[in-house]
């Protein structure tokens, strides 16, 4: 199958775009789920977190204390991988050469801070789905209560049998049953003042 050639253009206001490249939110999400996409996720999320999902490599570099070239390379390599993985289009820049940022970004323009790019809406939606599903999976597979299992609760029942209320409170201190940072000091004070 012949590759579709998509052209990046520059409009009168100086914005570069190649329009819709035909990659849906579902396709972007599917691409993000591949192991090969993992090295690029944090960079894409950095752009996603910016207002209107726009940013320059230099602004990202300052904000996240990473070289600007890091963002340039990550976006370029992700776009090359997407183009190769989908195998149905290539994007030609205004200079007549292959270009890649326009695959991931819906438009870009020159600013005093550097060239600013905006992530594609479909990719932003796919990243949101990815984050939501990743979070659900982490909770599903992770240990409850920040790594604590609940066996200690059953041990507490055994430890507090036939024990006074004050002794029960002393045994609860530091056991992650309640918000320890706020409550432990109150419980200690109550135990000391009886």
Q: Each predicted region: which residue ranges?
A:
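The alpha-helix within a helix-turn-helix
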Residues: 61
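Phospho-regulated, low-complexity intrinsically disordered regions of nuclear gene-regulatory
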Residues: 96-165
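Short helix-capping/hinge SLiMs at alpha-helix to coil transitions
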Residues: 48-52
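Short alpha-helical "packing" element that flanks the helix-turn-helix/winged-helix DNA-binding module
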Residues: 39-47
